[in-house]
UniProtKB/Swiss-Prot annotation:
Gene3D superfamilies: 1.10.10.410. Allows the formation of correctly charged Gln-tRNA(Gln) through the transamidation of misacylated Glu-tRNA(Gln) in the mitochondria. The reaction takes place in the presence of glutamine and ATP through an activated gamma-phospho-Glu-tRNA(Gln). Subunit of the heterotrimeric GatCAB amidotransferase (AdT) complex, composed of A, B and C subunits. Its EC number is 6.3.5.-. This is Glutamyl-tRNA(Gln) amidotransferase subunit B, mitochondrial.
Amino acid sequence: MLQQWLRQSPRAARVLRGSCCRGPQSGSLRHSPLPTAPHRCIRSLQTSATESKERIPLRKQLKQDAKALKAQKRQKRASEEASRTKWELTVGIEIHAQLNTETKLFSRASTSNTDTPNSNVALFDLAFPGSQPEFQATALLPALRAAIALNCDIQPVSRFDRKHYFYQDQPAGYQITQYYEPFAKNGYVDLFPHDGIAPEDGDHVRIGIKQIQLEQDTAKSQEYPPSTQLLDFNRVSHPLIEIITMPQIHNPATAAACVRKIQAVLQSCSAVTTGMELGGLRADVNVSIRRRDEAPGTHQYGGIGGLGQRTEIKNLSSFKAVEDAVIAEKNRQIAVLESGGVIEGETRGWTIGSTETRKLRGKEGEVDYRYMPDPDLPPLIIGHDLISNLRDSLPTPPDQLIEMLAGTEYGLSIEDAKPLIELDDGARLEYYQDVVDILRDLQQDKDAKSRGGLARMAGNWVLHELGGLCTKADLAWDAQRVPAETLAQIIDQLQRKRITGATAKQVLAMVFDGDRRPVPQLLEEENLLLRPLSRDEYLALAEAAIGQNPQMVEQIRAKNQLGKLGWFVGQMMRMGEKGRVEAQKADEILRELILGKSDQP
């Protein structure tokens, strides 16, 4: 009834709304206020602060955000520097790498990881009573290559030990390893800035390797929540080497660089077939913290004393996980010590994407493992002749290859040299060297100055242009898809200015897609050869481009903004016949017309 009266009497509605806003007074209507009326009234009386505030221009907002981000980074760096000044981080790493072998370490079962679960299993792998270990000598060769490449001293006599523990992935109740007398000792790995070490570590870090030991892998566990766990014993007794570094790492980035470098060394000498990305290499890190202004700690690790209590983080499966886990554990230990707590020696875990490590179990000591010599295995005796032959047959170490590629012979940047070495197990590097050799033969009629940049140009085409086509097509590297001679001929035509850069990329794509015509024939039949423009044609194109934007011309003349010449070059290339306008000549003509500078004699 009231609502109908209000609709028929707008003036009464206004009075009632005003009364609602003023609150109840004597003589006012006794009816309850309408549910929506106060809200309408309140909105009509309020003024929004955000509406009256000036809107910040987008460019200004972006600048403010960039400044805030820089300030945060400066604050973070200052905090990290203060932490480094006060606390000393010490890291040691244990790397477990699956060796490149066809048979297991103590049985003739296959090491294939693609077969049906539990199909490559010998009686000894499952610890059947009465079964005996049979050492497979073929597993020793990749292990020796790894040890030599890591600058270790090979021991003429080494022995196997049993490491006792009870877990479902180890059916024998012990793991065969080389705890007391490993086959290799006293090695090292050198790290440089291009390996990714922390800037505060300088230009060179040498990390000692305490020992490398042969051991057998465990079964692979697969969990199916909530309560099912399956075991694949194909992996049991797969040959491993455990590489134990000295605790000489003091930065998380350097810890990750160390693992990355060791993996690269192992792959370069064919000691392993896969790396961290496919599970062929796993890392455990030991982390300890101590205050720099206090007396050295009482703990010892790897023969180095004065350390804080260490914790071990198990089964890290990526380089980023190594760095992130060390950072998280460092921060956790610092927080515990600063709050008056005590670091417990324990084993901890790490989950990708997490910010904290988690406790798995109390750290087991050496006595708990009850190490003892394995009575079923004789000593491992390694002859000096075998070591000498393997040493002579090893490929050039990665560091020497980088030094060669970045030197005067090739002149590549470190950023280009590293992937050439690391990609495709050396196949990309071999292909690149073939391209350079052929290209230099094709350019013999040129002077030394013209030939000086051929290797750098070839590196760009192999890595970025051809590599980009492989990536885009999601294809593995195949040197026969674009033979080295074909790529060298394309680059040669480009160097002689018979084709443009765009045409060279077009021809490369055609060959990549299966065109097998010789390069000269392809260029002729597809009408891709560059037909140079005359000077008058360049002048006409330049004048047309200048006429499109006279304001920009004035900016170039008045403020010497030479970078804007590139816009006019682009316009000339768009207006001209495809493939005929050379950017360098277009730039020369533009400078002559706009700046009055001519390269003509």
